[in-house]
Amino acid sequence: MASVKSFKRKYLKLRKSFDSVVLETEEIEQKIAEISEVYRRILLENAHLNDLLIDMNSTVLPTPPASPPGSPYWEAKPVSHTVFLESPSDVFTLEKPIASTHRWLSKLTALSKSTNSTLSTPKSFHSPLQSRGISPSSAQSSAAVSSSRKQKRKRTSEGPSERRARKK
C-alpha cells in the first residue's frame, strides 16, 4: 500500500505542475495573438504612411512608386521621372502646390522655408567634445595629467617606510 500512496502523491504533484504549465502556455498564446494583431495594424499603418510620404515627395520631385503591384496603394500609371536638381536648396525655392489632402504638410513646408536657415547651409563636422565645449587638445592633456598622477601614487606606495601602521 505504501507504493500506491507514493505513486498517488507523485501523480498529483505532476498533475499540478502540468496544469500550471498548460495555463501559462495558454496565456502566452493569447499574448502572441494580441501582439500579432498589433503587428498587422502597424504594418498597414506603416505602408499607408510610406505611401503618403511618397505622394508628398512626388509633388516636389517625382519618384517611382514604392508600393509593389497588388498592394492597395499601388498606382497603375508610373510617375514621370524628372532630372534632379543640383543643390538641395533649390528644392525649397520651388513653388509647386501640395495636394489638398496634405494641408498640414503645406503649412509645415511654408514654415520650414521661412524659419529654417540651416536647410541651405552645409553642415560642418562637430566632434562630441566640441559640443560639450571641450577642445580635443585639452582633453588629451587632461588624460596625460591623470595618468601621471596614477604613476606618482604607485611610486609613493611602494616603499615599506611609507606604509601606515595599523591600529590595534
Curated annotation (Swiss-Prot):
Bias-annotated ranges (Basic and acidic residues): 156-168
Species assigned in the record: Schizosaccharomyces pombe (strain 972 / ATCC 24843) (Fission yeast)
Disulfide linkage: none
Keywords linked to the UniProt accession: Chromatin regulator, DNA damage, DNA repair, DNA-binding, Nucleus, Transcription, Transcription regulation
UniProt-annotated location(s): Nucleus
Coiled coil: none
Top-level taxon in the UniProt lineage: Eukaryota
Biased composition annotated in UniProt, kind: Polar residues: 115-129
Quaternary structure and partners: Component of the INO80 chromatin remodeling complex.
Entry keyword annotation includes DNA repair: yes
Record-level Gene Ontology MF annotations: DNA binding
Stretches the record annotates as Disordered: 115-168
Cellular-component GO terms for this entry: Ino80 complex; nucleus
Main localization of the protein described in the UniProt heading: nucleus
Biased composition (Low complexity): 130-148
Purpose: Component of the INO80 complex which remodels chromatin by shifting nucleosomes and is involved in DNA repair.
GO BP: any one term: DNA repair
InterPro entries: Iec3_N (IPR032742)
Protein name in UniProt: INO80 complex subunit 3
